[in-house]
C-alpha cells in the first residue's frame, strides 16, 4: 500500500472506483468546483506487460488514487493539492528519458545490422519498436494537454517546468519515429534488391 504526505500528515491512498479503469483509453483531468478527477493510460516499458491504468481524485483535504496495478512504488508527498499531483506526474516520467535512450540504442543496432547485412527478422523488430514509439508519442501529447489544464486549474508555475520535460520527451519520440521509418525503408530497399537479384538469376537459369 502506498501512502501520501499531505498537509504534514501521513494519509492512506485509498482505492476508488476500480471498475471504471476498464474504460480508460487516454489521459485526462477534469475539475469541478474544488474537486479534481483524472484518469491515466500509461504505456508499458516491458514487452511482457500491456498498458497500465490508474485514476485520481483530489481536493483540499483528500488525495485518492485508484492504482490496482501498483504503478507507484514510492511515497507521494505534497503540502497542497497541486504539489501532490505534480509529484505524482514527475514520478510517472522520471525514468522515461533513459527508456527512450535505450530504444534509440536498439534502433542503432538494427541499423548496424542492416548496413552489414547480418541478422534477420528486421521487419518484425522494426514493427514492434514503431508500435512502442507510437504509444509513447501519443501518451506524451496527452500528458502535455493534462499539464496545461493543471497549470490553468492551479496557476502553479511548476507545471510549466513539467510541461517542458514532457515536450522534450515528445520531441525524442518524434525523432525516434522518423528514425524507425528510415530503417523500415532501408530494410524494404534491401528486400527489393534481393528479390531483383533472385529474379535475374532465375531469368539467366531459364534462358
Locations of the language-model features?
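A generic short alpha-helical patch detector that favors 3-5-residue windows
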Residues: 77-80, 102, 172-175
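Helix-boundary and N-terminal cytosolic regulatory elements
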Residues: 1-83, 106, 142-160
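A short, ordered amphipathic alpha-helix with a cationic face
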Residues: 75, 99-101, 136
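Short charge-dense sequence patches
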Residues: 47-63, 77-96, 118-134
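Cytosolic regulatory modules rich in charged/polar residues
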Residues: 83, 87-97, 101, 105-127, ...
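Generic structural signal for short, flexible, solvent-exposed coil/loop and linker residues
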Residues: 18, 25-27, 77-82, 88, ...
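Membrane-associated alpha-helical segments
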Residues: 120-207
